Amino acid sequence: MHSYRERLSVPVGWWVLAVVCVVLLGTEVWAGLGGFIPVLTYAVLALIVGAVLVNWSAAVIEVTGGTLRAARATLPLDQVGKVVALDEAQAARLRGPRADPAAHLLLRPYLKRAVYIEVADPASKVPYWLLATRRPAELAAAIQRSHETVG
C-alpha cells in the first residue's frame, strides 16, 4: 500500500516545445544542405530530445512500507528528522546558494517547489534530501504520517 506516489513527468508543454525545436533545427539543416542529411538530423534530434524527456519522466517519489523512495534512492523512514514543504523561493535557496554538496537531490527544471527531508542518522554522510514535487504539502504529510507509524 502506498501512502504517497508521484511520477515527476514532464509537462505536455515541454513535449510541444521539444517538437517545435526539433522541427525548427531540422528545417535549418534542410534549408542549408538538402538531401538525406536533414532526415538524419530530424531523427537524431528527435531521439536525443525524446530520450532526455523520457528519462526525466521516469523518476518516481514513493512513500510506502516504512521507506521513502526517490528514483533509485531509498531512505528508511526511521532515519527521517525534520520534514518541510518548501515554496518556490525556499526551494530555490536550497537548490542554489544554500545547497550542501553532500545532500541528496532529486530536482527537475520544470518543478519549482520541493520537500526538505533531514536525515537523522548520525552515521550518514548525507545531511538532507531535497525532492522536487508538484505537491509538497501532501508529500511532507505522507512522510510525517508514515514516520510516526514506523518510529
Predicted regions and their residues:
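Hydrophobic, well-ordered secondary-structure segments
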Residues: 20-21, 47, 62, 116-120, ...
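Cytosol-/stroma-facing membrane-proximal "stalk/adaptor" domains immediately downstream
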Residues: 132-151
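Non-transmembrane, membrane-adjacent beta-strand/coil modules in membrane-associated proteins
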Residues: 71-130
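Pocket-edge structural micro-motifs
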Residues: 6, 119, 133
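Short, aromatic-rich membrane-interface segments at the entry and exit
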Residues: 34-42
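Short acidic, gly/pro-rich beta-turn/loop elements at beta-sheet edges
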Residues: 16, 127, 139-141
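Conserved beta-hairpin
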Residues: 44-84
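N-terminal membrane-targeting/pre-transmembrane regions
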Residues: 1-33, 151
